[in-house]
């Protein structure tokens, strides 16, 4: 464990101070600025396995995993070797490559809902594109999303969003016209009756329902029994589409994602993070008859200069090959169980009211004793206490997501020894809060 007396981040502070004159807020994505946990962010120098090293030489056990992609651990040697081989052939083609076919076949084989897939460059791009597709296929304009669920920063989704929007305490974003979000209906997550009411009020105008099947962008929140099943039934009843945003859960909570885990098959799915092995990537796919609407096969236009990038495809292929190996998800479940149950126990033993849980390689803990079923429940958590907890863990060599409203991630590189060190640090920090 790192000695708190020797912990310093002088170089990180200098770099971040300079960055604030060069980039808005000093970062390329808001949550990285540590606004919800106080202090200034650490600047990374390198990552390897379950560890990150900052520019001041401090080493941390990492439970952010570059926000989800690093399920095999950072800089996995087999992924790096595959990338070296691909790099010699060029960084970008802007044309078809065989790696697209290989990764597409792997995704289609793995994800129950996907019969055809289109690769893009980010989760935001995937969700933005699939929303257009839902509207094109149904001829309807309205969508239902859930409070606290985050589907990227496209205008139509910035209504009661989670992730960085929740971190900053913003209900939406300036610059988004009301006309853009007029067709975005919202309901509390896990509230099937609220969804039913929206369908009753708009029986012929809802194109579909979009959600994180397991919420990771308002903290870690699981679906109540019957919730996903109820959504599937409602969308079928009203002729609407069901879309799972599995950018975070895809290949993480099961090889086939949340839809495999819960046995509910949506019409469409978005993916990202894991399928790029740490490189920028996104994808959307679903039923062949719906995907046939996408250009150039159909009239719904969507394109991208770097889509299907050979390096991203290569990293994704090797990552999925690693995940196919026997015992992968059993191991992820084991280490995440030890971590999550251990954190909850040491927190409660120290007199703190907490709740939380995990599924495979995804977990979360809220500083509230009440069960968290939706975004409103999540907002009752003690954000200030989480900020102090985060800082204490950082000083002891443990890097957690810098927001109460983000899920945590484990990887195949995490060991039981890493978990023990983490719990020892947590015990020390929680005793002092």
From Swiss-Prot:
<keyword id="KW-0663">Pyridoxal phosphate</keyword>
<dbReference type="InterPro" id="IPR005814">
    <property type="entry name" value="Aminotrans_3"/>
</dbReference>
<dbReference type="GO" id="GO:0030170">
    <property type="term" value="F:pyridoxal phosphate binding"/>
</dbReference>
<comment type="subunit">
    <text>Homodimer.</text>
</comment>
<dbReference type="InterPro" id="IPR015424">
    <property type="entry name" value="PyrdxlP-dep_Trfase"/>
</dbReference>
<comment type="pathway">
    <text>Porphyrin-containing compound metabolism; chlorophyll biosynthesis.</text>
</comment>
<keyword id="KW-0963">Cytoplasm</keyword>
<protein>
    <recommendedName>
        <fullName>Glutamate-1-semialdehyde 2,1-aminomutase</fullName>
        <ecNumber>5.4.3.8</ecNumber>
    </recommendedName>
</protein>
<dbReference type="GO" id="GO:0008483">
    <property type="term" value="F:transaminase activity"/>
</dbReference>
<comment type="similarity">
    <text>Belongs to the class-III pyridoxal-phosphate-dependent aminotransferase family. HemL subfamily.</text>
</comment>
<feature type="modified residue" description="N6-(pyridoxal phosphate)lysine">
    <location>
        <position position="273"/>
    </location>
</feature>
<keyword id="KW-0413">Isomerase</keyword>
<dbReference type="InterPro" id="IPR015422">
    <property type="entry name" value="PyrdxlP-dep_Trfase_small"/>
</dbReference>
<dbReference type="InterPro" id="IPR049704">
    <property type="entry name" value="Aminotrans_3_PPA_site"/>
</dbReference>
<dbReference type="InterPro" id="IPR015421">
    <property type="entry name" value="PyrdxlP-dep_Trfase_major"/>
</dbReference>
<keyword id="KW-0627">Porphyrin biosynthesis</keyword>
<dbReference type="GO" id="GO:0006782">
    <property type="term" value="P:protoporphyrinogen IX biosynthetic process"/>
</dbReference>
<comment type="pathway">
    <text>Porphyrin-containing compound metabolism; protoporphyrin-IX biosynthesis; 5-aminolevulinate from L-glutamyl-tRNA(Glu): step 2/2.</text>
</comment>
<dbReference type="InterPro" id="IPR004639">
    <property type="entry name" value="4pyrrol_synth_GluAld_NH2Trfase"/>
</dbReference>
<dbReference type="GO" id="GO:0015995">
    <property type="term" value="P:chlorophyll biosynthetic process"/>
</dbReference>
<dbReference type="GO" id="GO:0005737">
    <property type="term" value="C:cytoplasm"/>
</dbReference>
<dbReference type="Pfam" id="PF00202">
    <property type="entry name" value="Aminotran_3"/>
</dbReference>
<keyword id="KW-0149">Chlorophyll biosynthesis</keyword>
<dbReference type="GO" id="GO:0042286">
    <property type="term" value="F:glutamate-1-semialdehyde 2,1-aminomutase activity"/>
</dbReference>
